[in-house]
Amino acid sequence: MAERDLNEYLAKIAKAKVNRRSFLAASGLLGGSAALAACTSGSGNSAAPSAAASAGGAPSTPAPASAAPSAAAIENELFIYNWSDYIAPENISAFEAMHNTTITYDIFANNEELLAKLQGGASGYDLACPTAEFLVPMVEEGFIEKLDQSRLPNMKHIDPALLGQKWDPNNEYHVPKDYGTTGILVRKKVVTEPVTSWREFYDLAVGKYSGRVVMVDSLGDVLIMPLKMLGYSLNETDPAKLDESRKILTDLAPHILALDSDTYQDKLASEEAVLCLGWTGPLLELRENPETADTEYVVPSEGTLFWLDTWVKLADAPHPNAAYEWLNWIHDPEVQAKETEFNGYATPNLEAKKLVSQALLDDPAIFPPDDVIASLEGADPAVTDDEGRLALWADFKSAIG
């Protein structure tokens, strides 16, 4: 993504009023055999982190030291609440070995679940990875703390185009993690018809490939499809336009295999599902396997969502020094490049980008070209708690079962 185009795009979406919350999802990633052993507890676990676990395997190359190690003692535990399989296992292993620290990695399926868990009194976590627009309600509700920038020298590597945005205008509360889009994954050896738009996705889902369609479990991503099919903004709240979207989703619901943010790549690999509304994360693993190398990722012609995921330090984090050390170390360029190679999402770290393979840099699914950038739309934080959208989502989920 050219810096000029990213600046222009972010300037455009930053004009949206920021006052409540919006959903921009990013998950999926590598599944099955590549899943982190550190993920010892799932999205439905108790409020506090569970027993500590670590990812197996040593890093293939020596991990670089943190650019500015904290003078304070680094605690021997670190609790992370994150999307599934969203950290390179070798980086977890390296951090644990460097600091004799055990990382516990609990997962959530979407931003709504993360926020609800914190609202329900969850405590004991040090770090979490909300999508950018969720910074606003998390700050308002006191769930995250301002960061001491003197302890984060590696922030100098972050693309300035991603900083100073409405969700955190003074860059006080977050460290950018990854960015990407929401689109369609297609098993082309099964689906021979063209899939270039949300309309074509819908027609195939309710027709020939009924029952073999999976969608990520996230309101803000799923609503993109009917709204863009109808020519509306993905932030639409007008009741009449939402009713039009409701009709589309009501007709679609009987044909959906599952709402699944964590293992949809496994369903694609087995051909249980051959169409998916999701993210680019699983694409690398699927393409590397000869049996699933036919998997393609499509940014629909009607347009779709741009999202940015972030690192935040939670209020009253029990292991603050380990948290700061992680936040800085993860953006050492060598470490960050391993993240991109593992998870298949675009890095905001300009120096790390120089170390990423040319194949990834040239992949339009991961680093979108200019024409795709022009079609993207950011989510308005004001719409997430819109009652009409929430009711529509609840009805759709109930219809799927």
Language model region names:
Residues 40-49:
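Bacterial lipoprotein signal-peptidase II cleavage site
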Residues 242-251, 257, 291-315:
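Periplasmic-binding protein-like
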Residues 67, 71-137:
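Early extracytoplasmic/lumenal segment of secretory-pathway proteins
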Residues 314-374:
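Mature extracytoplasmic/periplasmic domains
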Residues 81, 86-89, 128-272:
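Extracytoplasmic ligand-binding site segments that recognize negatively charged/polar headgroups
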Residues 185-190, 228-231, 307-322, 327, ...:
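A bilobed periplasmic-binding-protein/Venus flytrap-type ligand-binding module shared by bacterial periplasmic
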Residues 1-18, 29-36:
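N-terminal secretory signal peptides
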Residues 266, 370-401:
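Conserved C-terminal helix/tail region of periplasmic/extracytoplasmic solute-binding proteins
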